């Protein structure tokens, strides 16, 4: 049996699929460059540099003896804590494993048939395109205007709406540009279509509260807000995501969502993180402070342009170097940032820099001075 037989069985959309390119890990860089993992600064994956609540370790140890048992498909304690944290009813929440990616995939499995149209403004989170392609949807691209600091061109969204449009993705704050979408523009999109409007709020904790659509989502028939524990809660390795929408949307999605995708350990970590409000608030406060420190430091370099952000990362445009060369120079010195070449709608001279601890930001800025000078 030759490989050609496998080729004949693979779906055409998978053959053509341009896969998602994840950020590099400390372990990968340690192996490649001979640097100790503890000496590497990771500013490439939009993680919480202070990690999860210190109370989580004890709770994981308490749960270890139960991992031979299946988890609860819907954990009532987690739902209660989420409801309290978000100030929305439990019936308006859906929780999944694999971060918000599972919720995105569940949206496609619930609402999108072959050939249906989805609208994706670019540049944005690549997983929307990947999921749309896998589910054989027709992608129509809208845009963020670079000359306006990547403000959403709302007309480009509205002009792409047809009677075949099923889903519209609005990432706010947007990844990788960091900007929010103005409330009036979100509202225009919602009101001018009966398609499902997905408002991705993965980074909303770092933005001004007035831009948060979570509590408003259940009031609409065509809105779902995506949230995650991977960012400010420091649980990227536990893969917990959730959505908030009206009960009808949630009920249909629950029919197709994987049953046991959220592990016992993931559930107990999420519950503990929600209960440690003091640690959460400190991470938000310090994250914003780190972002400001990073932004002010980057603005001093004349050979780069840094864009304002409401997230936990900054988009940087390089004026004299390509992203690949720039990232390589940083990697040699033990610093990971994200090459944005793989993001649709950006060129090969953009990188994304995540927040770090205050010490990490200081060290990064000193290393950057070496490279640019």
From Swiss-Prot:
The keyword Transferase applies. Pathway: Amino-acid biosynthesis; L-histidine biosynthesis; L-histidine from 5-phospho-alpha-D-ribose 1-diphosphate: step 7/9. The modification N6-(pyridoxal phosphate)lysine is found at residue 231. Its EC number is 2.6.1.9. It is an enzyme of class 2 (transferase). It holds the Pfam family Aminotran_1_2. Keywords: Amino-acid biosynthesis, Aminotransferase, Histidine biosynthesis, Pyridoxal phosphate, Transferase. SUPFAM superfamilies: PLP-dependent transferases. One of its GO terms (biological process) is L-histidine biosynthetic process. Its cofactor is pyridoxal 5'-phosphate. One of its GO terms (molecular function) is histidinol-phosphate transaminase activity. Signal peptide: none annotated. It catalyses: L-histidinol phosphate + 2-oxoglutarate = 3-(imidazol-4-yl)-2-oxopropyl phosphate + L-glutamate. PANTHER family: HISTIDINOL-PHOSPHATE AMINOTRANSFERASE, HISTIDINOL-PHOSPHATE AMINOTRANSFERASE-RELATED. Belongs to the class-II pyridoxal-phosphate-dependent aminotransferase family. Histidinol-phosphate aminotransferase subfamily. This is Histidinol-phosphate aminotransferase.
């Amino acid at each position: 049996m030759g490989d050609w037989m496998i080729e004949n069985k693979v779906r055409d959309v998978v053959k053509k699929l341009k896969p998602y390119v994840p950020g590099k890990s400390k372990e990968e860089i340690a192996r490649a460059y001979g640097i100790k993992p503890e000496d590497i600064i990771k500013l490439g994956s939009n993680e919480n540099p202070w990690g999860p609540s210190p109370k989580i370790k004890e709770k994981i140890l308490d749960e270890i003896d139960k991992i031979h048992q299946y988890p609860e498909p819907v954990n009532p304690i987690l739902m209660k804590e989420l409801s309290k944290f978000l100030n929305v009813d439990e019936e308006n929440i859906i929780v999944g494993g694999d971060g918000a990616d599972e919720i995105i995939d569940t949206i496609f499995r619930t609402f999108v048939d072959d050939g249906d149209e989805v609208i994706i403004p670019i540049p944005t989170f690549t997983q929307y395109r990947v999921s749309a392609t896998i589910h054989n949807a027709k992608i129509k691209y809208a845009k963020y205007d670079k000359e306006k600091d990547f403000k959403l061109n709302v007309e480009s969204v509205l002009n792409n709406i047809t009677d075949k449009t099923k889903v519209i993705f609005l990432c706010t704050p947007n990844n990788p540009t960091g900007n929010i979408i103005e409330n009036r523009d979100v509202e225009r999109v919602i009101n001018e279509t009966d398609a499902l409007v997905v408002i991705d709020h993965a980074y909303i904790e770092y933005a001004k509260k007035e831009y948060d659509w979570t509590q408003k989502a259940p009031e609409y028939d065509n809105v779902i807000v995506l949230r995650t524990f991977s960012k400010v809660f420091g649980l990227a390795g536990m893969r917990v995501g959730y959505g908030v929408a009206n009960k009808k949307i949630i009920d249909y999605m629950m029919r197709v969502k994987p049953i046991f995708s959220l592990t016992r350990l993931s559930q107990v970590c999420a519950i503990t993180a929600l209960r440690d409000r003091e640690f959460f608030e400190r991470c938000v406060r310090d994250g914003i402070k780190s972002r400001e420190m990073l932004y002010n430091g980057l603005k001093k370099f004349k050979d780069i342009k840094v864009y304002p952000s409401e997230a936990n990362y900054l988009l940087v445009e390089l004026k004299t170097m390509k992203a690949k060369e720039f990232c390589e120079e940083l990697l040699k010195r033990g610093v990971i940032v994200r090459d944005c070449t793989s993001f649709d709608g950006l060129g090969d001279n953009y990188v994304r820099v995540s927040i770090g601890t205050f010490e990490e930001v200081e060290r990064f800025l000193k290393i950057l001075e070496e490279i640019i000078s």
